[in-house]
């Protein structure tokens, strides 16, 4: 179970701390669940942008932009211990920086738009947001999907993370046998 591995590997406090340090929602911890099941050795399929690698599934260009050293096996299907996209702490710091950047764009009105931007690319989402009414109430994920066609992958991505965040609040209520992975990580316990 990925959530159990999150706790056992000690990643929950690392991710929580980096999100909290940047005043980001702690529920963004579930992005790494959707990206890789919290597996730092994950390697994505080849794309026109290269291969995404690591727990946060950075392509080389984005990883480098956010301070990660990219290894010589960047576009191969091989794990590369030199590639910091595979490093749990360093890639989490980079992911938190990237999410903070997205949060400062036009996507800031909605955490769901930030998630869509992380998956589909902030340019794709922001270009559509900018053509929407200026009223913040009209600039949200639900209006985006009602007004524009977005990739099914992005739609599913956002809803899976949203669902994981809801379930994560009280997993036993939904029939899962694990505790809230965020429980006890904040000062209120």
PLM regions: where:
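Short amphipathic alpha-helical segments at helix boundaries and their inter-helical linkers
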Residues: 36-54, 129-130
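Short, functionally critical alpha-helical segments immediately adjacent to catalytic or ligand/cofactor-binding
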Residues: 24-41, 114-119, 162
């Amino acid at each position: 179970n990925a959530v159990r591995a999150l706790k056992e590997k000690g990643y929950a406090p690392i991710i929580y701390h980096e999100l909290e340090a940047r005043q980001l929602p702690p529920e963004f911890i579930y992005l790494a669940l959707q990206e890789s099941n919290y597996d730092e050795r994950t390697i994505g399929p080849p794309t026109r942008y290269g291969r995404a690698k690591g727990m946060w599934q950075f392509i080389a260009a984005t990883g480098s932009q956010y301070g990660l050293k990219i290894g010589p096996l960047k576009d191969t299907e091989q794990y590369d211990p030199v590639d910091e996209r595979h490093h749990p702490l360093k890639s989490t710091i980079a992911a938190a920086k990237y999410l903070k950047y997205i949060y400062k764009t036009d996507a800031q009105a909605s955490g769901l738009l930030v998630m869509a931007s992380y998956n589909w690319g902030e340019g794709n989402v922001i270009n559509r947001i900018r053509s929407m009414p200026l009223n913040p109430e009209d600039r949200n994920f639900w209006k985006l999907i009602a007004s524009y066609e977005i990739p099914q992958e992005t739609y599913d991505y956002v809803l899976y993370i949203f669902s994981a965040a809801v379930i994560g609040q009280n997993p036993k209520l939904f029939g899962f046998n694990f505790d809230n992975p965020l429980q006890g990580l904040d000062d209120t316990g």
